[in-house]
Amino acid sequence: MEKKLLIAVLIPPAVIIAYSLYFHIDFVNVLKTMDPVLLALFVATYLVQLLILAIRDSRITKVPYFTAFKARLLGNAVGLVIPGWAGQDLARASVYSRYNQDLVKSFALSLSEAFYDVVIGSLMFLVLVEIRASPVDFIYILATLGNVVGWVAGTGYVIFTSKKVVKAEERLIKLMRLENYYSLLQKGKDMVKEATTKEALIVNSLLTLLGYLVQSVAFYYIVPSFPLDVLVNMTYFAASLIPVPASSGFAELGLSIYFIPRVVVALRILELIDYSLGFLLIREISLKDLKRQFDEIRSYGKLSERPSS
């Protein structure tokens, strides 16, 4: 595991350096000549976005606002090296579980947050992509469409089957010999359904939209056209849906649609700086306790705080 994490950590800088060498860009010079105003803008808009999303996340999880902010900041950092639910979603859940002492509930609600992140972000990209369409966009169109369909279908299934007996689901659980996990699945479904009311869908979607718009403001310093700035930001987001550490390769490719290579390198460095800020809170995750709980699930299909207790 340590070797895999080390490789994941090394991939993003290695790809940026390789990109720089390919286009004959002085990587060190890009760092030295980084515009401090642009750096400040990227950090400021990123943190403001997280402050907005923390309002949404605290509504969903019922944890204190600052706890939600820390979880979001830390989750994004972990997501740099561990893509998908095992990264940022699980990291946020571990922070929430320190507050509510319930890992299953925390993880289910963390996935509810991810629903808004992915679906709203993907729809924004799909709506705006025609502003400056490129053959390369086909990759990101597939990624965003697939995620919209998958998340909407999956979340819809969870909501409509909560507290219901689904024979096909029971047969599948038995076939896969996961009977001990069934109560955990049902508990997770209940948490998602409770958090997904009509009012919550509207308010949480609007907060997510606002967060992405605020984050896009940083690009206005380079390209003074806000619709295009939002598209650039959402293209970067679309690249993050592809499960590789820090969207390495795909982020550079997406940014290359709009910018010259030197600017691409600078923007990638800025984005990595933003997302790495969360590592300052890495102690918020109790890795030892998290491993203990998941080992218990793996062995017995149960948690210390069982759904029936």
Region spans (language model):
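Extended hydrophobic secondary-structure segments
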Residues: 86, 91-92, 105-106, 121-125, ...
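Transmembrane helix boundary and interhelical junction motifs in multipass membrane proteins
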Residues: 51-56, 84-93, 231, 236-256
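Membrane-embedded alpha-helical segments of transport systems
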Residues: 78, 82, 107-130, 149, ...
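Predominantly cytoplasmic-facing regulatory/coupling regions of multi-pass membrane proteins
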Residues: 1-75, 131-241, 270-309
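Long, hydrophobic/aromatic-enriched structural stretches that serve as scaffold segments
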Residues: 74, 89-94, 102-105, 189-192
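Membrane-interface alpha-helices at helix entry/exit sites of multi-pass transporters
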Residues: 69-70, 84, 88-89, 99-115, ...
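Helix-loop junctions at the membrane interface of multi-pass solute transporters
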Residues: 59, 80, 84, 92-100
